[in-house]
Amino acid sequence: MSQSISSSTKAEEVVSVDVSQAKTLLQSGHQYLDVRTQDEFRRGHCEAAKIVNIPYMLNTPQGRVKNQEFLEQVSSLLNPADDILVGCQSGARSLKATTELVAAGYKKVRNVGGGYLAWVDHSFPINTEEEEPSAN
């Protein structure tokens, strides 16, 4: 079977880092792109100075579907030359998102293997937004 050029980016071309490496990179100024749903993000996310939540998949009455505006939303907030870490709950969605970003020309993007669950397992700092008031 032949493969089209548009789908030529393979997972092997995507760089993955573990959560310990990710924590160090975040401390050195990398941006964190959390691709989980907004509800997952609000329940808890890694502590990072520069963090953005853009879901890769959306919950619908029919189940989860890919966010068709994902690349457009990312490009409105992040530059292809930025140092970006991409994470999700376990590493599956972020791997797909990272693969798509690499194919779209993002040069310094890395997948966070293990995702938020691994971050929590390592007892790294987290933030939650469930109980916080929206204004002072």
Curated annotation (Swiss-Prot):
Catalytic residue list: 88
InterPro entries: Rhodanese-like_dom (IPR001763), Rhodanese-like_dom_sf (IPR036873), STR17/STR18/HARC1-like (IPR044684)
Entries under SMART domains matching the protein: RHOD
Gene Ontology molecular functions: thiosulfate-cyanide sulfurtransferase activity
EC number: 2.8.1.1
Catalysed reactions, semicolon-separated: thiosulfate + hydrogen cyanide = thiocyanate + sulfite + 2 H(+)
Main EC class the enzyme belongs to: transferase
One Pfam short name: Rhodanese
PROSITE patterns given in the database record: RHODANESE_3
Compartments it resides in: Cytoplasm
One GO CC term, this protein: cytoplasm
Keyword Transferase: yes
PANTHER family: THIOSULFATE SULFURTRANSFERASE 18 (PTHR44542:SF12)
General function of this protein: Catalyzes the transfer of a sulfur ion from a donor to cyanide or to other thiol compounds. Substrate preference is thiosulfate > 3-mercaptopyruvate.
Protein known as: Thiosulfate sulfurtransferase 18
Organism: Arabidopsis thaliana (Mouse-ear cress)
